[in-house]
């Protein structure tokens, strides 16, 4: 709550809903996205783009989901207790400050532990490959701005390999 008070401009409110309080039509047509930082926490800190990179990532993912006629209205954390606990909150706050729509936050732990790779998540264990994947980074590569990437892969292992290589390219 204190973080929200310091980061939010103007007033804010928190509404809590149980899934059975949300109309079935909305549940069937609304999606949530896991937002997380991928790469070295030390490099992310050095780059100083922790929050804005998350917004670029979310923007890429929204575009990827539109290709599948799906809209994202909620964010959730890929892991609780580590750095990625804060990512959905920061993305929601920064996106709103940049004039974006309000993004809801889902309060649950998607994995119950730290997730070192995309292919070690509970989604992957249940057979749901991270597809599509939206990546965002603010640094430039060879003078060209490379802020958004959309990746469509068949398997979680492919997604992980491509995402890790892009982290190397973006020096994150």
Task: Give, region by region, the residue ranges found by the protein language model.
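Flexible, glycine/charged-enriched surface loops at secondary-structure junctions
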Residues: 13, 169-172
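A structural-propensity feature for long, helix-poor, extended segments
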Residues: 27-40, 120-166
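A short, small-residue-rich loop immediately preceding and capping a beta-strand
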Residues: 71-83, 101-106
């Amino acid at each position: 709550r204190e973080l929200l008070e310091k980061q939010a401009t103007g007033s804010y409110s928190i509404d809590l809903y149980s899934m059975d309080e949300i109309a079935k039509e909305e549940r069937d047509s609304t999606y949530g996205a896991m937002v997380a930082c991928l790469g070295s926490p030390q490099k992310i800190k050095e780059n100083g783009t922790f929050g804005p990179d998350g917004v670029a990532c979310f923007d890429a993912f929204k575009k990827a989901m539109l290709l599948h006629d799906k809209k994202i209205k909620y964010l959730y954390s890929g892991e609780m207790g580590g750095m990625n606990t804060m990512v959905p909150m920061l993305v929601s706050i920064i996106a709103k400050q940049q004039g974006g729509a309000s993004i809801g936050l889902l309060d649950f732990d998607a994995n119950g532990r730290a997730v070192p790779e995309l292919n070690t998540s509970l989604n992957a264990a249940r057979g749901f490959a991270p597809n599509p994947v939206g990546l965002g980074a603010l640094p430039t590569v060879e003078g060209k701005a490379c802020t958004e990437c959309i990746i469509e892969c068949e398997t979680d292992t492919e997604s992980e390999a491509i995402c890790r290589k892009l982290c190397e390219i973006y020096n994150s």
